[in-house]
Design a protein with these regions (language model features):
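Extracellular/virion structural assembly segments
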Residues: 1-413
């Protein structure tokens, strides 16, 4: 670890001990809630951006233990500069034909791999060129990344006062640096010659991510990524004491003392497999968690068995669920492109089938239908959310959604 004097954040201790360790990235929002007698609710965001923390676990041998003890004991409340390797990119030369050349010293702009353009480097922030724990360089950033149409690379323009001081090979890791402080305590566990450390950094200037507007229905977001039980997804089983009852058809019910009606809820488990998915998950969570922005979520476990499509009518096997989901209908075709429809009426027949009349013609061949499911009106049921970085591009996050006033609020008129 080395000291670095920043023109924006003054003296910082660059914490480079953990670039391959597990990390849990937590975002904490704060909202004010007003509950009505019927259980409906209104939430107001009290923070414009979430408070972020990074919790690390890493090991060092006994030769490093004494030095680390002195650092943590002496600098417990001092400021650190912590690399965020969950947003790391590769350094490249500014022309493809010279992509294996060195990035020479004195550069005031760096080119990074264009395939992951979401480098979360802040204006008037810091970045680190990292090769090893003892071989790195900190630079201050004057501008956000910009797209270079000529060379198809993302250009990170560095502040004029912090040109590179040495040459770096193409492929060097580039990571954002966040000014942080140790928010609680440092735990040191000794086992033989190995010392395990656990500590949490709180970020002083967390970035507000640019929100991507997803698919919408009636100006309300739709989550079309499947996280519930299926051959491609896993339902989390870490349910807590708030469970009130269980229905195999409807899933879990949640009930709290402030609610006069039950809410249908589902626990989610989101697994990302690369940095791009991880970054997209962070943006999606930020959009819907802190502001408790409602969204539509397809009930993937209720896959309707379609018999025939005729203009604005669908013949399907009666599943007994259509009375519950009166509002919207989602259709997913083999191309992966979803179409959404409002349910006008449902007619059940003695032969065990039903006719669903929709708000417009279904211009899709019945053989081209991949998936049909209802849409429920939901929100995330938490102020906080953690993404646990396991390594090698893999992260895991568990969270829960609940329906908003199910079967009591008419959403379409």
């Amino acid at each position: 670890m080395k000291k670095f004097t920043s023109k924006y954040f003054h003296e910082l201790l660059v914490f480079t001990k953990q670039p391959t360790a597990e990390m849990t990235e937590t975002y904490e929002h704060k909202t004010d809630i007003v509950l009505a007698k019927d259980g409906t609710e209104s939430r107001t965001a009290l923070r414009s951006k979430p408070r972020a923390t990074y919790a690390f676990k890493f090991s060092e041998d006994s030769n490093e233990a004494q030095g680390l003890y002195n650092v943590f004991h002496d600098k417990l409340r001092d400021k650190y500069a912590v690399p965020v390797w969950t947003q790391s990119l590769k350094l490249k030369e500014n022309t493809p034909e010279y992509s294996t050349e060195l990035i020479f010293e004195g550069k005031d702009a760096l080119y990074v791999d264009w395939a992951l353009i979401d480098l979360d480097v802040m204006i008037y922030g810091m970045a680190i060129l990292y090769e090893s724990e003892d071989n790195f360089e900190v630079v201050e950033v004057g501008f956000r990344p910009e797209w270079d149409d000529l060379n198809e690379y993302t250009v990170v323009a560095l502040d004029i006062g912090t040109k590179t001081k040495k040459s770096w090979p193409s492929g060097t890791v580039v990571m954002p640096l966040r000014p942080c402080y140790i928010s609680d305590k440092v735990m040191q566990s000794r086992r033989g010659l190995t010392n395990a450390y656990t500590l949490t950094f709180q970020v002083l200037n967390n970035a507000v991510l640019d929100e991507d507007t997803p698919e919408t229905v009636e100006d309300i977001d739709v989550y079309l990524t499947q996280y519930l039980s299926s051959e491609n997804a896993v339902r989390a089983i870490d349910f807590d004491s708030e469970i009130d009852s269980f229905d195999p058809l409807l899933g879990r019910f949640y009930k709290r003392t402030t609610w006069l009606n039950n809410r249908v809820g589902s626990s989610m488990r989101v697994v990302t497999t690369n940095l791009k998915e991880y970054y997209d998950a962070r943006k999606r969570f930020q959009r819907h968690r802190g502001k408790f922005r409602p969204f539509w979520y397809p009930s993937f476990e209720d896959n309707l068995k379609i018999i025939e499509v005729n203009n604005d009518k669908i013949e399907a096997i009666d599943d007994g669920m259509s009375d519950k989901y009166k509002y919207l209908y989602v259709m997913r075709v083999s191309t992966g492109e979803p179409s959404s429809f409002a349910i006008i009426s449902v007619v059940r027949k003695p032969d065990g089938t039903m006719t669903i009349t929709l708000d417009r013609t279904v211009d899709i061949d019945v053989n081209d239908i991949q998936y049909v499911s209802y849409i429920t009106y939901c929100r995330m049921d938490t102020d906080n959310l953690s993404l646990s970085w396991v390594g090698n591009g893999v992260s895991v996050s568990n969270w829960r959604i609940v329906e908003l006033a199910p079967s009591t609020k008419k959403l379409l008129t």
